[in-house]
Amino acid sequence: MAQAWAFLLPVLVFGSYVTSLFFPSYISGPLCGGDGGGRSLFLCAQAPKDQDPSPAVSTMYKTAFHFQPAKNWMNDPSGPMYFNGFYHEFYQYNLNGPIFGDIVWGHSVSTDLVNWIGLEPALVRDTPSDIDGCWTGSVTILPGGKPVIIYTGGDKDQHQAQNIAFPKNRSDPYLREWIKAANNPVLRPDEPGMNSIEFRDPTTGWIGPDGLWRMAVGGELNGYSAALLYKSEDFLNWTKVDHPLYSHNGSNMWECPDFFAVLPGNNAGLDLSAAIPQGAKHALKMSVDSVDKYMIGVYDLQRDAFVPDNVVDDRRLWLRIDYGTFYASKSFFDSNKNRRIIWGWSRETDSPSDDLEKGWAGLHTIPRTIWLADNGKQLLQWPVEEIESLRTNEISHQGIELNKGDLFEIKEVDAFQADVEIGFELASIDDADPFDPSWLLDPEKHCGEAGASVPGGIGPFGLVILASDNMDEHTEVYFRVYKSQEKYMVLMCSDLRRSSLRPDLEKPAYGGFFEFDLEKERKISLRTLIDRSAVESFGGGGRVCITSRVYPAVLADVGRAHIYAFNNGSATVRVPQLSAWTMRKAQVNVEKGWSAI
């Protein structure tokens, strides 16, 4: 369960090119937004003064192809699975409004991970062990094709325990009704050293070599954060193993742990309960510090423990699933297409009063295929192929050269609903600026200090999206290339500081680094999906992913927006291929299996 309450505190154009006059070395104050001569200047040191929103917070911020219910609050994905021809998405849902509270398990089904039918809640708060909330959990498919939900419930004193539910009728293709086990809760935090209010979010179960089921639960043990390990013969009666799957003494409570097997360089998924191929690694993910982090290592069967390849004490250096507004992710093995899929919760970053006016809050990111890179060091992610079924009106350009200060407008696509794929080829790598390893501790800070208005040797180059006519509003997604002693480091940023003129918004600069062998690859790829208030960007083939929430006034006012490719580095950047599509609207919880969705 994500502790959601913590988040509530709250042109002069020549053809398609724009001249280098758009890139003064550093502009501020009255020059921001224009130079007095009709030219648009967007790389400002200081954003224009906020303006009040439209009389009503526009429904235009509702996404067109992301998963979200028609109304009210949602947070964590819970128990995704593929079963009997349908994908099931359960999620944390408030039946009563667009604020956190009264949490039940929402439920939707799909055949393609794009279009969803909303159903009645699978689990509601109606027993003593879950009266405070039906919190996050997982689904495990038992032998014989028997799905079982295991989830965290809170009692009247907010003590947490794990509960189980089974489908009432497995022949129902939608699995609408679920029956809770009579002996719930099946797992309590009764052991010495455990914290009864920090014990939640059980993982999908897996079978060990001894034939026993295993499961991890996020918790605190003797003040340490841990993925606690449990065993069972029948999935109903559980015994705590005398050591955790893994623990750490320097981090906050681990929420929403996830544990799965991956094979280096192979994007096929692995079922953790099946035979794991030789050479496979394991990933342990935890939601902590308001972000999702992970480690790569091995599952030591003799010790029944996860062993990281590299033990990093400073959790600021732990690997990240996503560097933006992304939390409480959940993965599952998709037996339909033999892949592992992950998605996360992206919260709103406007104000709670905006959410009340909108009548909804929260969405899930586009489902992503997730696998291990060839070098076995990091996870890669890419939107599932099904999302491409929404593409229409393809625009394609080849052989674009971007010199310092150039903007190239990507026209004839819907700038509010678009999928853009672009590759940047570097003519020279000699101009890369030196890399400072201390930047790894806070890449967001470095993105803020070295924004797109600050020229570098190689970069910044990337995309300007959701840009208003006069550039007063725009979001930048871009790269900078640095030279370390024996390798190149690429910084990817998603800078929202000038994304909107509306007040009371979070407008940070997100960022993450990745290693890149520029001498071999020479090209850095970027894919950005724009869906009104949600932007998901994938850099370097999925090495860094950044989810952003943006609320430009131009969208609320039903105005016009623009997309540009740009370069503000000294080195020329070539774009061998640029493709963009308008994205059609998906049918997300519009077809109702239940009147309240």
Curated annotation (Swiss-Prot):
One family name in Pfam for this protein: Glyco_hydro_32C
UniProt-annotated glycosylation sites, renumbered to this chain: N169, N237, N249, N568
UniProt note: pH dependence: Optimum pH is 4.5-5.5. Inactive above pH 7.5.
UniProtKB keywords: Disulfide bond, Glycoprotein, Glycosidase, Hydrolase, Signal
Activity regulation information from UniProt: Inhibited by sucrose.
The protein's enzyme class: hydrolase
Record field: temperature dependence: Optimum temperature is 30-40 degrees Celsius.
InterPro entries: ConA-like_dom_sf, Fructan_Metab_Enzymes, Glyco_hydro_32, Glyco_hydro_32_C, Glyco_hydro_32_N, Glyco_hydro_beta-prop_sf
GO BP term, pick one: carbohydrate metabolic process
Cysteine pairings via disulfide bonds: C447-C493
GO molecular function terms attached to this record: fructan beta-(2,1)-fructosidase activity; hydrolase activity
Active site: D76
Position of the signal peptide: 1-20
Catalytic activity: Hydrolysis of terminal, non-reducing (2->1)-linked beta-D-fructofuranose residues in fructans
EC number from the UniProt entry: 3.2.1.153
Family note: Belongs to the glycosyl hydrolase 32 family.
Protein role: Hydrolyzes inulin-type beta-(2,1)-fructans and beta-(2,1)-linkages in branched fructans. Has low activity against beta-(2,6)-linked fructans. May play a role as a beta-(2,1)-trimmer during graminan biosynthesis.
Name under which the protein is recorded: Fructan 1-exohydrolase w1
